[in-house]
């Protein structure tokens, strides 16, 4: 019997309509299954609940329809990728079988067989050209759409977590919860990037498409297994091993092989979750120590503290390396096992199918398609094994972000002084009690009222609770109770710390803080800077520098008074806000404050007797919770 004519493995004239139907059906089934699985993960797994708590508002918020539509489009891209891979396997089958038929025709002298093989070869090349264009187009669109989704999600989540961190002053009150968190800044910057990329423990890369993400990578793997199983099932024959016949041997071989390899991989890779989490935590702690040294460079230089700082940095760096060594050893074992498994299986389909090819039961193209299907099923079933370390790193990012969300919620839930707006622009403290973290009373219940234009100086020995009282009134200190009535409009009440906050940006931004720089004319800024003895800075308003390092502590405190004049509050609390100034300049600034804002209520914390004369009333904290409130003995100075 002579060689047979070439016959295409599928009817290519029906490939397009059949593919459209297949893609539509596969997308619908996949969407339903993915949604069901995500719901189950949400309710049945701890990390699913954590994931949902972090980003729930993005998927059920006002723009959620657009989010789900984008996910649907990305899922469509995944389904198209699988369908193209299936068609490529048939195209490869036709190409190799056509070559085989052409060679058989040449060898047998049968021109008809030869011509059928040649026509089949060029037909397969034409099919390949069309599919290659579709494949490249899909990949480019896939990367673009994936990046759009990731970027939009990251923008939203960064804003969401930043606002959550700022809301209710959680950024400060987090310090007082039982289990404090480390480096919230890194969690918002780095872990959000890892979280939204969804590719494992690495930040987003511009080349990432759906196949790079854990979710869509898993979906593509499952669809590929189902799609190529049908092909492999039809191409598999019976294998005899020690007299035992195994039908559909190729299919069962790949299932058993991958199952055993995956179980062993999970055993080897299990510690990677904790090692990845510790790697992030320890590196963040070391980075924070370096940042602190940079910010305190002048103080360290005065102390000649280089040796101590070096020792402290080394102490923090040593556990980074110790943990990383364990991480590397475990990763080498994990990756070594996966590589061995992947390399061992490469020749297996050829070895198993070779006897059937030599017996003429199948064509060469069938063997090639068998190897392609076998490889796709193996790679797809191995997805979870190969990406176990990526899942571990992604899980670590979820833990860290959930820790931030949880800490913010606990920080906001801590008790605080109840603040109410006053009807007459007065400041009134009702039953304000301040305690230490251990529960000891720091200030007994306190009642004070100041009307418009009134002033109060708070004095007492160090540790008596002066600054803590101001923190309590600012709703920062959680170990306090009582009610504070104060002017309640935006920026109608200001609190100034001893070392003013200097934000990043231009000098204009620094001086106008917390107001918008665009809302204040240059002439007003220059006039205000001149009044607080900072006239030399008037020509530097648009310079962008690290002003916290450029300005001296005294200049920073004068900037704080400039902010008061620009904001025009109705009440201001100052915590030793002139401690870096000489007595004369201190007096001048208080006189300026009273002349510019005569109706403003001024409450100051001070250690200087001279400052007491600039106020009408004095609250002296005596220690042990006791206090004394009385008019200032000397008549208040003209301020």
UniProtKB/Swiss-Prot annotation:
<keyword id="KW-0472">Membrane</keyword>
<feature type="binding site">
    <location>
        <begin position="462"/>
        <end position="468"/>
    </location>
    <ligand>
        <name>ATP</name>
    </ligand>
</feature>
<keyword id="KW-0547">Nucleotide-binding</keyword>
<keyword id="KW-0067">ATP-binding</keyword>
<feature type="binding site">
    <location>
        <position position="498"/>
    </location>
    <ligand>
        <name>ATP</name>
    </ligand>
</feature>
<dbReference type="InterPro" id="IPR050835">
    <property type="entry name" value="ABC_transporter_sub-D"/>
</dbReference>
<dbReference type="InterPro" id="IPR027417">
    <property type="entry name" value="P-loop_NTPase"/>
</dbReference>
<keyword id="KW-1278">Translocase</keyword>
<feature type="transmembrane region" description="Helical">
    <location>
        <begin position="20"/>
        <end position="40"/>
    </location>
</feature>
<comment type="function">
    <text>Multi-solute ABC transporter that mediates uptake of unrelated hydrophilic compounds. Can transport vitamin B12 and related corrinoids, and antimicrobial peptides such as bleomycin. Transmembrane domains (TMD) form a pore in the membrane and the ATP-binding domain (NBD) is responsible for energy generation. Contributes to maintenance of chronic infections.</text>
</comment>
<protein>
    <recommendedName>
        <fullName>Hydrophilic compounds import ATP-binding/permease protein BacA</fullName>
        <ecNumber>7.6.2.-</ecNumber>
    </recommendedName>
</protein>
<dbReference type="InterPro" id="IPR036640">
    <property type="entry name" value="ABC1_TM_sf"/>
</dbReference>
<keyword id="KW-0813">Transport</keyword>
<keyword id="KW-1133">Transmembrane helix</keyword>
<feature type="transmembrane region" description="Helical">
    <location>
        <begin position="249"/>
        <end position="269"/>
    </location>
</feature>
<feature type="domain" description="ABC transmembrane type-1">
    <location>
        <begin position="67"/>
        <end position="393"/>
    </location>
</feature>
<dbReference type="GO" id="GO:0005576">
    <property type="term" value="C:extracellular region"/>
</dbReference>
<comment type="subunit">
    <text>Homodimer.</text>
</comment>
<dbReference type="InterPro" id="IPR003593">
    <property type="entry name" value="AAA+_ATPase"/>
</dbReference>
<comment type="similarity">
    <text>Belongs to the ABC transporter superfamily.</text>
</comment>
<feature type="transmembrane region" description="Helical">
    <location>
        <begin position="121"/>
        <end position="141"/>
    </location>
</feature>
<keyword id="KW-1003">Cell membrane</keyword>
<feature type="domain" description="ABC transporter">
    <location>
        <begin position="427"/>
        <end position="639"/>
    </location>
</feature>
<feature type="transmembrane region" description="Helical">
    <location>
        <begin position="213"/>
        <end position="233"/>
    </location>
</feature>
<dbReference type="GO" id="GO:0005886">
    <property type="term" value="C:plasma membrane"/>
</dbReference>
<dbReference type="GO" id="GO:0005524">
    <property type="term" value="F:ATP binding"/>
</dbReference>
<feature type="transmembrane region" description="Helical">
    <location>
        <begin position="68"/>
        <end position="88"/>
    </location>
</feature>
<dbReference type="GO" id="GO:0140359">
    <property type="term" value="F:ABC-type transporter activity"/>
</dbReference>
<dbReference type="GO" id="GO:0016887">
    <property type="term" value="F:ATP hydrolysis activity"/>
</dbReference>
<keyword id="KW-0812">Transmembrane</keyword>
<dbReference type="Pfam" id="PF06472">
    <property type="entry name" value="ABC_membrane_2"/>
</dbReference>
<dbReference type="InterPro" id="IPR017871">
    <property type="entry name" value="ABC_transporter-like_CS"/>
</dbReference>
<dbReference type="InterPro" id="IPR003439">
    <property type="entry name" value="ABC_transporter-like_ATP-bd"/>
</dbReference>
<feature type="transmembrane region" description="Helical">
    <location>
        <begin position="332"/>
        <end position="352"/>
    </location>
</feature>
<dbReference type="InterPro" id="IPR011527">
    <property type="entry name" value="ABC1_TM_dom"/>
</dbReference>
<dbReference type="Pfam" id="PF00005">
    <property type="entry name" value="ABC_tran"/>
</dbReference>
